[in-house]
């Protein structure tokens, strides 16, 4: 849960008894339930991305300095960043374009990125060795989820030079 003293816990939009994923969870729930069209949040260790994934929306963690943040403690740089959330990648990207830029009160902010909408280079996945793990070796998974994961990953394994099932040590 995301707990707030006045209003209580914010539950997951798919099952209110479960967590919304973290500190930007209220924004993710508001997006998922149609309360707002766009939202922003901060990300230190997954605070945008985790709630977005738990709530079925998109969260982007920009590189440090892309979105200026006046008043951010210097000790948290470059780990803490501000970023967008949206219902779709296009929505989140649109907000990122609006957020990106410099601020005279943030000495770590970077010059605006002018090529955010340039096409990405095509990656040659055929030269990449991939390790595929459903649980990173530390999270218990039910047989049902393991089966779903195996089915889903079977659709893209062939794109890699090598794809092995393993977990990090």
Question: What annotation goes with each model-predicted range?
Answer:
Residues 116-120, 144-168:
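Acyltransferase
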Residues 37-38, 129, 162:
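Beta-sheet entry/capping signal
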Residues 61-147:
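A short helix-breaking turn/cap at a secondary-structure junction
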Residues 33, 58, 123, 159-160:
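Residues at alpha-helix termini
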Residues 2-99:
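Short glycine/serine-rich loop segments
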């Amino acid at each position: 849960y995301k707990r707030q003293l006045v209003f209580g816990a914010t539950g997951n939009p798919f099952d209110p008894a479960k967590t919304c994923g973290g500190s930007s969870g209220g924004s993710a729930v508001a997006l998922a339930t149609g309360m707002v069209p766009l939202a922003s949040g901060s990300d230190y260790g997954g605070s945008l991305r985790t709630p977005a994934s738990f709530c079925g929306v998109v969260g982007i963690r920009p590189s440090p300095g892309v979105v200026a943040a006046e008043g951010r403690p210097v000790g948290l740089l470059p780990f803490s960043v501000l970023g967008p959330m949206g219902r779709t990648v296009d929505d989140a990207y649109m907000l990122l374009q609006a957020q990106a830029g410099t601020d005279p009160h943030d000495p770590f902010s970077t010059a605006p990125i002018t090529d955010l909408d340039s096409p990405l280079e095509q990656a040659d996945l055929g030269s990449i060795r991939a390790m595929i793990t459903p649980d990173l070796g530390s999270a218990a998974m039910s047989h049902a989820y393991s089966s779903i994961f195996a089915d889903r990953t079977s659709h893209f394994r062939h794109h890699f030079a090598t794809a092995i099932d393993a977990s990090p040590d």
